[in-house]
């Protein structure tokens, strides 16, 4: 299966379990792989047959910025549900990072894998 990817999509979200975290916007970084059959787009050179990564990116940004979250796990699962339902993906991999969440670590996060990308 072909894959469409988006790397380092940055979103600023109201996220965290501490009271002070809910008062600020924090950086979240998405890396995505989406199973998508690119054959028809390649054969026709017609954008109507491709997975529009600009549209996918905006859908993620709009959703994550629309409400507060406590956990990145919830963000990752809800974004996965959104993308699967909106774009009928065969598989999906989301790496969601919350940089600087742990002072001694460069990065922390979750990796969600669904469908044929397992």
Swiss-Prot record:
Its EC number is 4.1.2.25, 5.1.99.8. It catalyses: 7,8-dihydroneopterin = 6-hydroxymethyl-7,8-dihydropterin + glycolaldehyde; 7,8-dihydroneopterin = 7,8-dihydromonapterin. SUPFAM superfamilies: Tetrahydrobiopterin biosynthesis enzymes-like. Keywords: Folate biosynthesis, Isomerase, Lyase. Substrate binds at residues 21, 53, 72-73. One of its GO terms (cellular component) is cytoplasm. It holds the Pfam family FolB. GO terms for molecular function: dihydroneopterin aldolase activity; isomerase activity. The keyword Lyase applies. Pathway: Cofactor biosynthesis; tetrahydrofolate biosynthesis; 2-amino-4-hydroxy-6-hydroxymethyl-7,8-dihydropteridine diphosphate from 7,8-dihydroneopterin triphosphate: step 3/4. One of its GO terms (biological process) is folic acid biosynthetic process. Gene3D superfamilies: 3.30.1130.10. The active site is at 98 (proton donor/acceptor). It comes from the Bacteria. InterPro entries: Dihydroneopterin_aldolase, FolB_dom, GTP-CH-I_C/QueF. Belongs to the DHNA family. PANTHER family: DIHYDRONEOPTERIN ALDOLASE 1-RELATED. Catalyzes the conversion of 7,8-dihydroneopterin to 6-hydroxymethyl-7,8-dihydropterin. Can use L-threo-dihydroneopterin and D-erythro-dihydroneopterin as substrates for the formation of 6-hydroxymethyldihydropterin, but it can also catalyze the epimerization of carbon 2' of dihydroneopterin to dihydromonapterin. This is Dihydroneopterin aldolase.
